[in-house]
Amino acid sequence: MSRPTTPLLDKAPIPEALRALPESDLPQLAQELRAELIDVVSTTGGHLGAGLGVVELTVALHHVFDTPHDRIIWDVGHQAYPHKILTGRRDRIRTLRQTGGLSGFTKRTESEYDPFGAAHSSTSISAGLGMAVASDLSGEKRNVIAVIGDGSMSAGMAYEAMNNAGALDARLIVILNDNDMSIAPPTGAMSAYLARLVSGKTYRSVREAAKQVAKKLPKFLQDKARKSEEYARAFFTGGTLFEELGFYYVGPIDGHNLDHLLPILKNVRDTQEGPVLIHVVTQKGKGYAPAEAAADKYHGVNKFDVITGKQSKPPANAPSYTKIFGTSLIEEARHDDRIVAITAAMPSGTGLDLFGEVFPQRTFDVGIAEQHAVTFAAGLASEGYKPFCAIYSTFLQRGYDQVVHDVSIQNLPVRFPIDRAGLVGADGPTHAGSFDTGFLAALPGFVVMAASDEAELRHMVRTAAEYDEGPISFRYPRGDGVGVDLPERGQLLEIGKGRIVREGTKVALLSFGTRLQECLAAADELGAAGLSTTVADARFAKPLDHDLIRRLAREHEVLVMVEEGAVGGFASHVLQFLATDGLLDRGLKVRALTLPDTYQDHGKPDAMYAEAGLDRTGIVHAVFAALGREAVAAPFSA
């Protein structure tokens, strides 16, 4: 299929050129930008619906504001693809999320038009406030605009930032992109007229004069005057909550109508007051019928056919780890009505959508609020329930204080299923699950597990369900399982006990997580080179299986620990035990294979693991290096 024809977009490769276009050309430019976006994502995959919803808003922002001098911060960044196309990156846009290509999120090192990197939600207002205050301190005059979705506004951090911005009376513009909850839908021409009126210079100068007069009144009359003005505007336009936080509220307005957007943005740009919140209502997937009809299915997409909207998904050889978790938890919940499930706005991503279909009264989606999710789970556990608080590894970082203070110190039996453990590929370093083993295994009394395959995951779900002595976690990766046979229900694992998968005599490979398959492949290659190799599945990073580690250390010349996590995790705990137990005193050759001490850019997971030395070849090379020998070529192909 040929690429769309885009004569106006071709003339506007950067915002300076866009600002030279007459306003009458902008609707056509938006249409061309939308067509380009659909064509791009159909070939690369990625986040489509959010970007389609902000096409007109993106065009309007870059037309009205002097970027990059003025700062635009996109919360999360899923919606930033149109922004990338308009800011000098169109020639590389078809490398999106590919190895060596453009990031799927905003990234400071990628463009001067990306003043702040993003990928986790609800950070834009805090970052924008910092930039606004920095501008004031430096004596510079610039506009700072934070664009945040209504979903991100469910996180407490956004309100913390707004409260601070209101107290500072900072010159900050927040655009609330309301594309899902429809907090207050626009009501046509009257809504647009009122929004334009209250954002204009005349109204605001009169308002400012009234405020100066009010300052001469007794305080109780000042408060009454302020409240009267706020509620009068709120009667027509809404926004009382934001006014209470110290923001001047404008909206709601139609985010797809440039005739409404442009004058309001200009009014706000030209005022000296702040902070201001502009409430813009948009539609996810706008302008592409399949995405409009099923916004949830077009949030993140694989490559797809533009005509039909059908996504191309390679056939799976095994069910996904996420699905195995969801179905396993359903099975356990049938045996125990105290089991409840908690997600922080990721029901389908964590597999809890399946659980919710069977047990809707026992499923809780708390929104983008990981801190609350963890302490909410702690409260449930304190009353005898068995909460499974399912959060991606990267997002669990957001609730770590609650894990320590509210769960671990009180030794409450909260279960933490940790999805997206290890490298996640196209989403890059912001979404990699690198650190959970390290930050959880450091906590006294915390049980930390990792599944080596889908059957082990099923066992760990049951083990967690029946473990009541304290907090417990189990991690598993994105993607499909390896195709092992699955029991109908998991087995109960002995806490702190691993397993020997293959017996050998010379080399021992101790795996924590799904690198077990690579360890087995490495053992085949080592065996072909005359090095008999034991392969063990640790299962637990805490408590460690001391007996297993002693056996591996005493009966082998080389011990290699392999994990899909950062330095400071499983291997570090094993090394400390080896040293404390005196097992390093007899000449044991030890190597620890972890993720590198850097943030790996996005790419294909297999290639990223190979780069990290965590594939078969990397493991084999580590063994030969420990022995002081050159690796020999394998007699078989990968």
From Swiss-Prot:
InterPro entries: Dxylulose-5-P_synthase (IPR005477), THDP-binding (IPR029061), Transketo_C/PFOR_II (IPR009014), Transketolase-like_Pyr-bd (IPR005475), Transketolase_BS (IPR020826), Transketolase_C (IPR033248), Transketolase_CS (IPR049557). Pfam families: DXP_synthase_N, Transket_pyr, Transketolase_C. Gene3D superfamilies: 3.40.50.920, 3.40.50.970. The keyword Metal-binding applies. GO terms for molecular function: 1-deoxy-D-xylulose-5-phosphate synthase activity; magnesium ion binding; thiamine pyrophosphate binding. SMART domains: Transket_pyr. Keywords: Isoprene biosynthesis, Magnesium, Metal-binding, Thiamine biosynthesis, Thiamine pyrophosphate, Transferase. Its EC number is 2.2.1.7. Catalyzes the acyloin condensation reaction between C atoms 2 and 3 of pyruvate and glyceraldehyde 3-phosphate to yield 1-deoxy-D-xylulose-5-phosphate (DXP). This is 1-deoxy-D-xylulose-5-phosphate synthase. Its cofactor is Mg(2+); thiamine diphosphate. GO terms for biological process: 1-deoxy-D-xylulose 5-phosphate biosynthetic process; glyceraldehyde-3-phosphate metabolic process; terpenoid biosynthetic process; thiamine biosynthetic process. Thiamine diphosphate binds at residues 78, 119-121, 151-152, 179, 288, 370. Belongs to the transketolase family. DXPS subfamily. It catalyses: D-glyceraldehyde 3-phosphate + pyruvate + H(+) = 1-deoxy-D-xylulose 5-phosphate + CO2. The keyword Magnesium applies. Homodimer. Pathway: Metabolic intermediate biosynthesis; 1-deoxy-D-xylulose 5-phosphate biosynthesis; 1-deoxy-D-xylulose 5-phosphate from D-glyceraldehyde 3-phosphate and pyruvate: step 1/1. SUPFAM superfamilies: Thiamin diphosphate-binding fold (THDP-binding) (SSF52518), TK C-terminal domain-like (SSF52922).
